[in-house]
């Protein structure tokens, strides 16, 4: 199917330079626009050794002006969701009238961002220029919550869309991509300005499952203990306590919710900041999450729920 503004496809196999060249050329041919303004790529972890070469193949043969993305344990191509599979997904966009600029940032910069002028000064992008941002962040080597707070202060009122990279848990390794560069820490942000704006749509919501708990031992984004018990055991017990139909719905759809306001007497859907469950290790009992929770924080596991969509 040929379209004017966007096209997306899934490459299901391992790295194959000749095959990827032909595939990228065919995908580019499906986009009727005279140029590709932006490409977004998401690769499964088996592409780690070939990431730089893959980026070069895609940039050249799909004729992409600006390419960004990250590694991902799960992939989405159009209406297709691909879990626990190898390959990559590439989306091509024609954005007439858009101005685009990509920047890479690090944890060191997050720690240095003491005032709202730091990021415009560092990136060279003034707050009045973008209409919004796309961002992809490594969850293991950067405090994403500190970053987004300082970013929001610098670029107040501008939407930020994107997500956290993932890999093969428990290995704390992910990749972030910008044009031909591969980063294993920090994040990448794409400023989108000009005649193109960003609008968000929430496709699915989350429903709390089980009971609320207190985090009793946390190390960065690793949760060791919940209620003085191994975190993985609490997750397994929560899952096993669900009715069979709820267990079926929860497979591959579990998240963690961190309470926003600890002063509430009861917690319901909407009271949680929902973050990814990146992985878990039954031997050590550790859960890795896409956030930096704190010891003493209240949490509740969440199930992705199409009926809770808004």
Where are the regions that the model predicts?
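Small-residue-enriched flexible segments
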Residues: 1-52, 57-60, 65, 70-74, ...
């Amino acid at each position: 199917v040929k379209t004017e503004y966007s096209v997306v496809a899934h490459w299901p196999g391992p790295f194959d330079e000749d095959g990827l060249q032909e595939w990228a050329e065919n995908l580019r041919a499906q986009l009727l626009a005279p140029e590709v303004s932006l490409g977004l790529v998401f690769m499964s972890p088996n592409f780690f050794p070939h990431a730089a070469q893959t980026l070069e193949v895609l940039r050249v043969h799909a004729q992409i002006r600006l390419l960004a993305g990250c590694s991902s344990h799960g992939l989405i191509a159009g209406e297709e969701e691909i879990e626990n599979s190898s390959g990559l997904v590439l989306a091509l966009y024609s954005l007439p009238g858009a101005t685009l600029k990509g920047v890479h940032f690090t944890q060191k910069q997050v720690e240095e961002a003491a005032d709202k002028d730091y990021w415009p000064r560092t990136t060279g992008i003034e707050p009045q220029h973008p209409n919004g941002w796309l961002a992809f962040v490594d969850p293991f080597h950067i405090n994403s919550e500190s970053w987004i707070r300082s970013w929001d202060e610098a670029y107040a009122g501008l939407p930020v869309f994107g997500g956290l990279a993932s890999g093969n848990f428990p290995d704390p390794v992910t990749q972030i991509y910008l044009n031909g560069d591969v980063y294993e820490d920090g994040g990448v942000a794409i400023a989108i300005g000009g005649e193109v704006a960003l609008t968000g749509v929430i496709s699915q919501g989350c429903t709390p499952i089980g009971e609320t708990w207190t985090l009793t031992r946390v190390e960065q984004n690793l949760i060791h203990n919940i209620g003085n018990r191994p975190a993985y055991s609490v997750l397994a017990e929560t899952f096993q306590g669900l009715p069979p139909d709820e267990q079926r719905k929860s497979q591959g759809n579990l998240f963690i919710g961190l309470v926003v306001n600890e002063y509430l007497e009861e917690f319901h859907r909407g009271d949680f900041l929902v973050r990814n469950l990146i992985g878990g290790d039954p031997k050590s009992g550790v859960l890795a999450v896409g956030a930096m929770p704190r010891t003493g924080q209240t949490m509740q596991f969440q199930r992705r729920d199409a009926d809770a969509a808004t």
